Amino acid sequence: MTTPSFTTLAVHQDGAVAHIQLNRPDKSNALNAAMWQEIRAAFEWVDQSPTVRVALLSGAGKNFCAGIDLAMLAGVQQQTAHPDGARSREKLRRLILDLQDCLSSLERCSKPVI
C-alpha cells in the first residue's frame, strides 16, 4: 500500500513505523473539519497496511493539539440549522457521532498507537 497524502496531516513510513503528524502548527494543530476526516482515513490506512506494525502520532510545532478548531465550532450552528428543532438536533447528533467516530479510529486500529 502506498503512503497516503493529506492536507492537514504529514504521514510517512519508516520501516514498520507509520508516523502520523498533525500538521497545522500555525493553528496549534487545532482539529478542523478536514483534519477530523483525515485522522480517520490515516488510521484506517495504518490498520489495513500489511507493512505497518506500529503508529506514532505527534504534532508539528510546539503544541501537540489545541483541541477543536473554534472556527469550525462556530460554524456548527449554521451547518446543523433547520426550522424544525428536532431535525436540527438530529443533524447535530449525527455530526457529533461522526466526529467521535473519527477519533475512535485510533481505538479500532489493530496496530499499537503511540
Regions found by a protein language model. Give the residues of each.
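Conserved CoA-thioester-binding segment of acyl-CoA-metabolizing enzymes
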Residues: 1-60, 86, 90, 97, ...
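Short amphipathic alpha-helical segments
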Residues: 33, 69-70
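An acidic, glycine-rich surface segment that forms the CoA-thioester-binding/catalytic face
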Residues: 40, 44, 70-114
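Short, active-site-adjacent cap segments at secondary-structure transitions
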Residues: 61-66
